[in-house]
Amino acid sequence: MDSSLNVSDVLSQHHVPNASCDYLSPTVSQYQKRLVPIFYSFIFLLGFLGNMLVICVFCQSSSRRTVANTYLVNLAASDLLFLCSLPFWAVYYSMGYNWVFGRLACKLCGALLTINVYASVFFITCMSVDRYRAIVYPLSTRSVCHARTISIAIWLVAVLSTIPTLAFRDTHPLSNLNVTACVMIYPNELWHPMLTLAKNTLGFLIPFGVMATCYSRIGRHLLATPDFLEHDQNRIDRVLRMVIAVVLAFFLCWCTFHVLTFLGAMRDLGVTFSCRTDLAVGALLPISLCLGFSNSAINPFLYCFVGNHFREQLCRLYEEKAPRLTQKRDSISTRLSSFSRKLSDVKDSGTIENLPQNGGP
């Protein structure tokens, strides 16, 4: 059976271009080996802490179990799952495309990326639709139970989307680089462009179109409502700033990656590009991946830390936990002091008992 080997980038969906193009040039390899692992490590640390804090705060607060928070927690969980795979990819890049973690880890890390690509953008889209309904149609029914059902459906779709990754991703020796890479090995050449175009459409174009539509209508609704303009100007400014941030962050983080993978799919379908274009795509792919992955670290700040509700809940949680921690600390200090006094008394008592009664030798 004919097979098509994807070896240009472990996380992208490109094939190696023409032999005349030095796709993995020494310059590209050096900056990938040195800079990409640093970016991945930074994204992992920032995103892991941020998403863990989001999950802890919202799960601890039973009073704020809303539709929006349901999607926020699931979004944070999706980002957190993917971020757990970033250290593996960082090591992979630092070792020059040499995968040392085995076949199972290769498949699982690839699957976590695929899950995040779809789950993350679907949860962001659901949040956009929920905000649209809350502002434009405030009397419409929005239940937490319904949001949980939608979240389960999103997770199922995201997991199902990993079937091609689990089937085709595997370790494969690359003799020209003298490494064992974690790559996609397709049954034939049509699999790669078809899966890439599906990812471009379902994972970017449609969600971005829905988000842009929702937020443009929210903006028009707020600006066209006299009561909001007269009494809630600050609220309008805050919402509009959030709208712009949401749309721009998603677009800027993932647009470059999807454009580059789209060009790769077109090339595989027979569209001819110059050698310089192929080299540019190969050089920019790791950078575009860093941008896309940074969305997982930005999300907690974008959706939570700039919002009043999250800050209020974080402060409330701190106020609830701080007295308990203080009490525990005081209790431990008291016990230690008591223990020290008792130990001192025991030592003094033992010394007195051992002294000769005449006070001398």
Predicted regions located by residue number:
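Extracellular TM2-ECL1-early TM3 structural module of rhodopsin-like
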Residues: 32-37, 41, 65-126, 134-144
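Generic structural signal for small/hydrophobic residues in well-ordered secondary structure
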Residues: 51, 58, 108, 156, ...
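Intracellular effector-coupling site of seven-transmembrane GPCRs
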Residues: 182-189, 200-204, 220-259, 278-281
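Intrinsically disordered regulatory tails of 7TM GPCRs
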Residues: 1-27, 175, 228-233, 237, ...
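Helix-to-loop junction signature of class
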Residues: 40, 44, 57, 82-96, ...
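Loop architecture of class A 7-transmembrane GPCRs
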Residues: 17-27, 99-114, 137, 143, ...
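Alpha-helical transmembrane segments of multi-pass membrane proteins
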Residues: 44, 74-86, 114, 151-162, ...
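First transmembrane helix
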Residues: 32-59, 212
